[in-house]
Amino acid sequence: MPHRETPAPRIGLIPSLDGLRAASVAIVFWAHAEMPGGVRGGTGVTVFFFLSGYLITTLMRVEYDRHERLSLRDFYLRRVLRIFPPMYLAICLGLILTALGTLTAPVSAGGVAASAFFYANYWKIAELEGIPEGLGVLWSLAVEEHYYLLFPLLYVAMRRFLPRRGHQALFLALICVAVLVWRSWLLLHDGVNPVRVYYGTDTRIDGILLGAIFAIVLNPVYGDVRLPRRGVLGALAGASTLAFMAFAFSRIVATDEAYSWGYTVQGLLLIPIFAYLITAPTSWAGRVLNWKPVAFLGVLSYVMYLVHAPFLYAVQHVLGLPHVVEVALAAVATFLFAWGVNLAVERPLATLRKKISHAGESTTMMAASR
């Protein structure tokens, strides 16, 4: 029988996660809109990666603790129902806007296939064209989908052969170190283009695995560790936030050296940030992130992430208005499209996912990756 150190908790909505999604998609939108401040959109993607690793691993841990098994069939079916329909709607949107002439970049069958079958990241690494304009963001979804495909198998193996959570975390940490070494080798020894390490699953998967480590050994939902007093943890989270945002705005991360270690540092900084925001939802930061309008944007964030760039580029190509007006119109179009998809597609499918779930995740919590 598998070793279980902690009973599975009853989980519903984890505080602050939807708000963190909203903040992340706002960073990405601001960057792609080329608004003042020079914020780097990749910072938001890093948060998405960590959040996905944390939440998906939490769900798997709860299911395994309750049932002493993980239904891979149900896991993959839930992921398909969550990820595929909005993504294919976004691809259709890009193709329609291209056919109408509002998006002008050429589209190829290969680019559409790369988008649809989750290898857009390596398509971009190969400097191939043909992905519908604005849907280059699907590179990050490809990284996450590779994680969804492989990590459940690894997690089941760890629960069987490494029953203690500390050993599981150590094993994943060793993988993260290997990724860091590989990334550094590519950049500093082979001199590859930083684009190679930015987009590659093999060079970015550690960002997701750090979230998984957090879920396994430091999970606030389980009360795995006795956290410092709220004031101490808040100060640590505040300092980590300042350091994390320095990556978002500073050009220091544009160097090869920073590309090699920067993703690791950012992922580590997110640990105290997530720990505080999950355990202190009544703090001022927690109240902002859990404010209903902000949390609702987090619920819509997956679709908003998918379609914000096509709308931005379409508005810019067609209207010729002042930049800030175009950005505002694109933001409204993005929000309305995402809201419509949520009502017509995501909510009905969330109900279906809940019916096939062994772990009994809440509808909101199951909205895992973005």
Residue ranges and their predicted role:
Residues V47, F84, L149, A169-A173, ...:
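Hydrophobic alpha-helical transmembrane segments
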Residues R73, L77-A90:
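Alpha-helical transmembrane segments of multi-pass membrane proteins
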Residues G130-V143:
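Individual transmembrane alpha-helix segments
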Residues V143-Y147, I205:
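Transmembrane helices and adjacent periplasmic/lumenal helix-loop junctions
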